[in-house]
Regions:
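C-terminal catalytic "cap/lid" subdomain
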Residues: 1-169
Length: 169
């Protein structure tokens, strides 16, 4: 199946893998990732970092998918989870803030803040997974929807399941 318009966060996470990026920056209309579902807790603070995005219950945190099923913080965190799997950190920033990327880098000491602007210290940093999977395995897992089946003998199954092997020459 093809990616549809609205799957931009998913598409971006695939491009992180394809390009070999070292950092995934995802801009949003929100100020960052909130510590709780804003529908249930409007006073929830912004998380400045997430150590293990794979451990988050995204449905609980974001209230599930958005009404159209794409976009929103749910989609951004799914994309961040994918990037984390290959060892790439994600920075979720409010895209409407002037010079937000340069200001975020200035806050980290990477560069100077643009003239007339203070370093930006908002947004959410999503840490990479401690044990990243190889980019090739990521590509196999997410590049397309699986279809069909493969029958292998017991020896091949053992090699695939326990040794992380390949049946390709």
């Amino acid at each position: 199946s093809e990616l549809k318009f609205g799957d931009n966060d998913c598409l971006a996470s695939l491009l992180v893998n394809l390009t070999g990026a070292d950092l995934f920056i995802n801009l949003t209309s929100a100020s960052g990732v909130l510590a709780a579902d804003p529908q249930k807790n409007p006073q929830a603070p912004i998380l400045d970092h997430i150590d293990d995005v794979a451990a988050l219950d995204l449905g609980q945190l974001c209230g599930g998918k958005t009404s159209v099923g794409t976009g929103g913080m749910y989609s951004k965190l799914l994309a961040a989870r994918r990037a984390a799997q290959i060892g790439v950190p994600t920075l979720i920033l409010p895209g409407r803030e002037p010079h937000v990327i340069t200001r975020a880098f200035a806050a980290c000491g990477v560069c100077a803040a643009p003239q007339g602007h203070q370093p930006f210290t908002g947004g959410t940093w999503v840490c990479p997974a401690r044990h990243a999977i190889p980019r090739r395995k990521f590509w196999l897992a997410y590049q397309s929807d699986p279809a069909g089946s493969v029958h292998v003998d017991a020896g091949a199954a053992k090699a695939l399941l326990h040794k992380g092997g390949s049946l390709l020459p």
